[in-house]
């Protein structure tokens, strides 16, 4: 028995403990304080007390429910047989009689019995007497019930033999009243709590008992009615009385007990004498009215339709009908006995059979059901199953079978929710709606679409079709296998342990980031980079006196914005390197924005303090303007002056970095599947796809199945930043892994999966998704550019870019695409990691593109193919050079700019008109020079009158090419004779000037 204290119980109930203690004391539980223990019996007493206090009574109804599940097989729309689950639910409610009402009825019954004893002995054996003594019969049923429950197979009339030895002489003289009178004193007038189930059973039994009484009254005019009734009732007794679901059979068995006792001793003449009516007319009328009312109520209850889903039953065989229901062959005795003894025309017999059979018990129901057959249930027009071989109309069974074969199966329409994916075929859509594909095609034809069964429909069309069929259409996405990753991440939880900080060095180009990192690593990396600038993101881990620190070195050039953003995303602390002689530059500002967007703390390293022109104070002022406030100004950003050449301030810088790391309390699980970030990726000629990974949590082991973006694979080899083979890598350790199927994109998340098949599935899904998005973007770009280029002569410079690593490819493509203008557009046809191959050259031939190799070279076969077809191959190892040359090539493709240049001024001094030539002007060159092919502008009073070309230029009678200032000449204008004295001619030329970007 569970127990707890009053205080704990009050906490569970969310109420004050002292109030609960008062209620327990009021309920009769002797408790002193809130620390006393409360048992389950105390809780029951409290509940009973509270119910009485609130006027609640015990439950008066008992509801019994039962479920039965069966299966039927039925053909669906496609002709395939499928199994349908059929569930039958039954409910029975039993009402408990009020004890006060029962006591009142028993008292009234005893008074009537006392009055009946005063009647002469001849009138005593009247069969109507039990009607007036209903409560006595009910109470007599209570002690009879336990022996019946112990031996349910015996007839119920057997226990009635117990009172016979006590008064055998009275049994001969008075057959019926003797057992009834003996049964009276046995039950207690106040029912005990144990008797409650018997009362509950007796209550619904009462109407059936009255019905049987009216039946006996109806048979009083017949010669031997009581004998028939006795045999009929005893034939019904094999059903156990103790079952609560047999409300109509138990009273008959109880009533049969007093009648069965005299059956062995009394003579037939005495039984006939007992059938004579002797009770007063008034009592009989009241009994008849009450019995008829209750019989009507019972008939109404039994005739009420039950809402039960049942498999269709086969038609009953001829000759197997009894009463109104078909009884199975397993229980023939219950229906055969009344037919032998009872007369066919006796109304009492009919009613008894109906009452006994309709008041179904659960055992009868289960026996009545036939086992489900494997054949599909074929429905006919009226909704009933067709008869079998032995059914009615056996002669026409062949015709019925043919009709059934041609008859369409009528199924009730069920509105479903149909999940429609982005694309679905007509056949699949029909299967989802459980209709034939021809119906869907017919519906689409009505909508104006001619389709075939395998044609793929888009989501919108499919949803319209679903709605036309009356179903509810729900737009559904394809199954996303990436949901598996969320489940995996939720399951794998391990204890977090301290890890090393990841520090990213950021800043403007040439401010000394890599040199600073070199001094920390005691290695020379900057000199190895082409042009002395960092073009790759480097990852190193350094062991200092205070622990391990992982450094990420990002490029400072503007082209590497995405790389810097990735560095800030993967990092814990950012070291912002600013040159003391240069100050804050554009990439410095960008690095500040990246750090703030990632919520990463900053440590400013003011570099190059060893230079004479260094001005650290100016750097501080400029950084304050960028909202980076040093600690000495009241901010939270440490400023450390350092020199990458002399090593001054390096220890202070590391001290500040590790101090920030301690404040952050960096932790990560170690004993867990690894997760990380792809820092850099490239295609190595001998090793295949190689990716630089920063492990962020867990432990990466050799042989693990990894998923990185749209690529997957098994880790075949792991190298540290020094090129040494390692077997495992913990959190904050950068490693280079081999074994991926293709080069992942830099910035992709890497994670270890247990199942290679699942990794392949997710990678293929991502590839398809990426391809769809890429095609959609290209299609959108093509449409936009098509309309933009319709009226303009836009030129396109096609490029194929091949680089050594993924990050450089991303940066170079981004820089080249930004060069596009309205007149010349840069189109990167293909960009990838690796050397220049024959396929790249073939693509360049098809698209008339220039191939750019960044830190890579072309294969020998690719070189020959390029020379043969005149394809331009260009190699670069510095990103500046590549961008500048592409810019120059684009400038050469630009249309030249036309400028007008005035070269001379001429004044008209004389005007001559010559018939064959027209108007000739005698002029003086005031300024500059006049050339024959020049254009002129006619000015009159400084207003432009005409613009055109010179037709001829002569000095004296000779044609000349030009006339210089201070000389006179004669000239004619092409297409214009409107010349007057004093007009001026402005001579000019249009020159084409090459444009630059």
UniProtKB/Swiss-Prot annotation:
It is found in: Cytoplasm. GTP binds at residues 507-514, 553-557, 607-610. Residues 231-242 have a biased composition (Polar residues). Residues 101-406 are annotated as: Disordered. Coiled coil: none annotated. The keyword Cytoplasm applies. Residues 553-556 are annotated as: G3. Residues 607-610 are annotated as: G4. Keywords: Cytoplasm, GTP-binding, Initiation factor, Nucleotide-binding, Protein biosynthesis. Signal peptide: none annotated. Residues 385-394 have a biased composition (Gly residues). One of its GO terms (cellular component) is cytosol. Residues 116-185, 195-209, 256-280 have a biased composition (Low complexity). Residues 281-292 have a biased composition (Basic and acidic residues). Residues 507-514 are annotated as: G1. It holds the Pfam family GTP_EFTU. This is Translation initiation factor IF-2. The gene is infB.
């Amino acid at each position: 028995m569970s127990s707890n204290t009053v205080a704990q119980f009050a906490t569970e109930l969310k109420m004050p403990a002292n109030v609960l203690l008062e209620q327990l004391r009021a309920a009769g539980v002797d408790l002193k304080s809130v620390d006393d223990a409360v048992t389950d019996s105390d809780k029951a007493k409290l509940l009973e007390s509270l119910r009485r206090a609130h006027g609640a009574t015990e439950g008066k109804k008992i509801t019994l429910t039962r479920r039965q599940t069966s299966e039927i097989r039925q053909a669906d729309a496609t002709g395939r047989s499928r199994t349908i689950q059929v569930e039958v639910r039954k409910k029975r409610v039993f009402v408990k009689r009020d004890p006060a009402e029962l006591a009142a009825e028993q008292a009234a019954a005893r008074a009537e019995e006392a009055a009946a004893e005063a009647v002469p002995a001849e009138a005593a054996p009247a069969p109507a007497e039990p009607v007036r003594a209903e409560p006595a019969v009910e109470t007599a049923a209570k002690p009879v019930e336990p022996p019946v429950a112990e031996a349910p197979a015996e007839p119920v009339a057997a226990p009635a033999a117990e009172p016979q030895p006590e008064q055998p002489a009275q049994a001969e003289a008075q057959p019926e009243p003797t057992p009834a009178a003996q049964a009276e004193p046995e039950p207690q007038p106040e029912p005990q709590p144990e008797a409650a189930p018997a009362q509950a059973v007796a209550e619904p039994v009462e109407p059936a008992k009255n019905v049987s009484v009216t039946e006996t009254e109806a048979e009083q005019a017949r010669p031997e009615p009581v004998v028939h009734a006795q045999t009929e009732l005893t034939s019904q007794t094999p059903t156990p009385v103790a079952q609560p679901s047999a409300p109509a059979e138990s009273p008959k068995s109880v009533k049969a007990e007093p009648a069965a006792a005299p059956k062995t001793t009394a003579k037939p003449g005495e039984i006939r004498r007992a059938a004579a009516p002797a009770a007063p007319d008034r009592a009989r009328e009241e009994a008849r009215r009450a019995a008829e009312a209750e019989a009507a109520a019972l008939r109404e209850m039994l005739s009420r339709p039950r809402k039960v889903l049942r498999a269709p039953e086969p038609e009953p065989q001829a000759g197997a009908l009894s009463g109104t229901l078909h009884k199975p062959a397993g229980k023939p005795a219950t229906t055969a006995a009344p037919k032998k003894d009872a007369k066919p025309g006796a109304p009492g017999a009919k009613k008894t059979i109906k009452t006994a059979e309709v008041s179904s018990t659960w055992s009868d129901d289960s026996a009545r059901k036939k086992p489900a057959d494997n054949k599909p249930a074929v429905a006919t027009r009226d909704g009933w199953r067709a008869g079998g071989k032995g059914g009615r109309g056996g002669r026409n069974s062949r015709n019925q079978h043919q009709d059934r074969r041609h008859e369409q199966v009528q199924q009730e329409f069920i509105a479903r929710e149909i999940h429609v994916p982005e694309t679905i075929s007509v056949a699949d859509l029909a299967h989802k709606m459980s209709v034939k594909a021809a119906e869907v095609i017919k519906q689409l034809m009505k909508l104006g679409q001619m389709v075939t069964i395998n044609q793929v429909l888009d989501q919108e069309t499919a949803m319209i079709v679903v709605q036309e069929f009356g179903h509810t259409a729900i737009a559904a996405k394809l199954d996303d296998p990436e949901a598996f990753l969320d489940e995996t991440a939720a399951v794998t939880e391990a204890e977090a342990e301290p890890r090393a900080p990841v520090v990213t060095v950021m800043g403007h180009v040439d401010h000394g980031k890599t040199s600073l990192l070199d001094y920390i690593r005691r290695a020379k990396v900057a000199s190895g980079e082409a042009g002395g600038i960092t073009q790759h993101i480097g990852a190193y881990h350094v062991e200092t006196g205070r622990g391990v620190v992982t450094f990420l070195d990002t490029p400072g050039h503007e082209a590497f914005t995405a790389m810097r953003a990735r560095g800030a995303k993967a990092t814990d602390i950012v070291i912002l390197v600013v040159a003391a002689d240069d100050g804050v530059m554009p990439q410095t500002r960008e690095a500040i924005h990246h750090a703030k967007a990632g919520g990463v703390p900053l440590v400013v390293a003011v570099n190059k303090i060893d230079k004479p022109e260094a001005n650290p104070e100016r750097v501080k002022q400029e950084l304050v303007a960028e909202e980076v406030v040093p600690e000495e100004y009241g901010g939270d950003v440490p400023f450390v002056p350092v020199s990458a050449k002399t090593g001054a301030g390096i220890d202070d810088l590391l001290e500040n970095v590790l101090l920030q790391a301690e404040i952050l309390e960096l932790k990560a699980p170690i004993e867990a599947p690894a997760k990380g970030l792809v820092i850099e990726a490239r295609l190595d000629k001998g090793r295949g796809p190689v990716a630089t990974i920063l492990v962020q949590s867990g432990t990466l082991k050799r042989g693990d199945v990894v998923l990185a973006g749209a690529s997957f694979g098994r880790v075949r080899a792991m190298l540290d930043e020094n090129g040494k083979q390692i077997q495992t890598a913990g959190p904050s350790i950068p490693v280079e892994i081999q074994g991926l199927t293709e080069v992942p994109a830099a910035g992709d998340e890497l994670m270890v999966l247990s199942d290679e098949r699942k990794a392949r599935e997710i990678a293929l899904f991502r590839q398809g998704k990426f391809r769809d998005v890429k095609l959609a973007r290209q299609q959108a770009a093509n449409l936009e550019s098509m309309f933009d280029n319709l009226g303009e002569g836009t030129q396109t410079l096609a490029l194929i870019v091949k680089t050594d690593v993924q990050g450089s490819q991303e940066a170079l493509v981004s820089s080249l695409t930004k060069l596009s203008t309205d007149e010349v557009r840069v189109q990167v046809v293909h960009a990838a990691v690796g050397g220049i191959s024959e396929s790249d050259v073939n693509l360049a031939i098809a698209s008339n593109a220039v191939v750019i190799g960044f830190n890579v070279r072309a294969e020998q076969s690719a070189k020959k193919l390029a020379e043969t077809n005149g394809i331009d191959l260009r190699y670069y190892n510095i990103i500046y050079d590549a961008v500048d040359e592409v810019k120059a090539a684009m400038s050469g493709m630009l249309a030249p700019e036309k400028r007008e240049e005035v070269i001379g001024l001429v004044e008209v001094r004389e005007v001559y008109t010559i018939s064959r030539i027209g108007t000739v002007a005698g002029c003086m060159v005031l300024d500059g020079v006049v050339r024959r092919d020049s254009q002129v502008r006619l000015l009159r009073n400084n207003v432009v009158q005409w613009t055109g070309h010179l037709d001829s230029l002569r000095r004296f009678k000779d044609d000349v090419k030009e006339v210089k200032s201070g000389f006179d000449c004669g000239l004619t204008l092409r297409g214009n004779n409107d010349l007057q004295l004093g007009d001026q001619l402005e001579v000019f030329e249009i020159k084409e000037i090459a444009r630059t970007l």
